[in-house]
């Protein structure tokens, strides 16, 4: 367990946004399903992305890390056709995206697949897939509360009805898989679709690799079978969910300029810009992708987090220092992330002096003038909680003690390097200091 003592003080300087984790998952999968050689540039080797790389290796892709790119030989190439093992183990580590994307993909191959993982991953629901397996006679067994899932059987084309309000990862997993089946398929969304931005990223990546899918207003997706992922060179754009930490730092009087962001991005977490503007920030777009921030007193608002769940922890920090009451609604899904994020946000920010009321599907946040600090806080072993608390420390009256900071490696391994380069002041802390 690593512990940092982090001191107050504003951040100042320029930071390069780390590559998008969401796009990297999708780029690696599409390239690995391809028919030749792809080169993926600007990729961040976080724990989650390494899990997806290793998972696609387990399915037969040949993937090597070069100096400036990831070299991927797709499973449909002649070199890889006999590379897959009949009985394979796919280690997802703690990556929910890896698990939910790869479960249906694994069902296009003969033999059996065993999925294992760590942390909270065994608590992530997979009932959507179990229903499909039961309907198609695909054998599966699992241990409740622990990720040890075994699957044997071939997925067949057809019509699939999926809820849109559980996780878009199930929909993406099926969309990746169905074009490779022999016949045509249809995916019907039976409820309002949350996290549309993630579906847009999936469809965009698949289109970039030559796959065609008809999207009928996010209510149904028509997928032709017997398609081929066409290998290509691919660059991962900057990650808005990570840029959000420094945008909020700017809202709290830091002076950080964030570059390498695609201002036309399809990322759902780009909504951080619109949310902060509603909270009375002025955000300036610079030609090279920088976002310059001019700060004003923050105002309260109502935030629907259904389309951008990953930025809710750090947005909650900004709301804690707004004038008035902010309501963050439709965020019940955050309870089944790396931790119960609603509970973690409320408990840890309240320790610092915030005033947050946690409800089943929402957070009610009454703004305060200052955060006191001077206490020990815990990341809950969740990367987004750890980074949010680090940003919170910059405006506290006293230093904070942050426990379990290493979890940042899940998505942004260089976060504290960037934090330090911007003037962040912290050091390892030992009990009794």
Swiss-Prot record:
Signal peptide: none annotated. GO terms for molecular function: 3-phosphoshikimate 1-carboxyvinyltransferase activity. Phosphoenolpyruvate binds at residues 21, 96, 124, 169, 341, 384, 410. One of its GO terms (biological process) is aromatic amino acid family biosynthetic process. It catalyses: 3-phosphoshikimate + phosphoenolpyruvate = 5-O-(1-carboxyvinyl)-3-phosphoshikimate + phosphate. Pathway: Metabolic intermediate biosynthesis; chorismate biosynthesis; chorismate from D-erythrose 4-phosphate and phosphoenolpyruvate: step 6/7. Keywords: Amino-acid biosynthesis, Aromatic amino acid biosynthesis, Cytoplasm, Transferase. The active site is at residue 310. It is found in: Cytoplasm. InterPro entries: Enolpyruvate_Tfrase_dom, Enolpyruvate_Tfrase_sf, EPSP_synthase, EPSP_synthase_CS, RNA3'P_cycl/enolpyr_Trfase_a/b. CDD domains: EPSP_synthase. 3-phosphoshikimate binds at residues 21-22, 26, 167-169, 195, 310, 337. Its EC number is 2.5.1.19. Transmembrane segments: none annotated. One of its GO terms (cellular component) is cytoplasm. PANTHER family: AROM/DEHYDROQUINATE SYNTHASE, PENTAFUNCTIONAL AROM POLYPEPTIDE. Catalyzes the transfer of the enolpyruvyl moiety of phosphoenolpyruvate (PEP) to the 5-hydroxyl of shikimate-3-phosphate (S3P) to produce enolpyruvyl shikimate-3-phosphate and inorganic phosphate. Belongs to the EPSP synthase family. Monomer. HAMAP family: EPSP_synth. NCBIfam families: aroA. This is 3-phosphoshikimate 1-carboxyvinyltransferase. It comes from Clostridium botulinum (strain Eklund 17B / Type B).
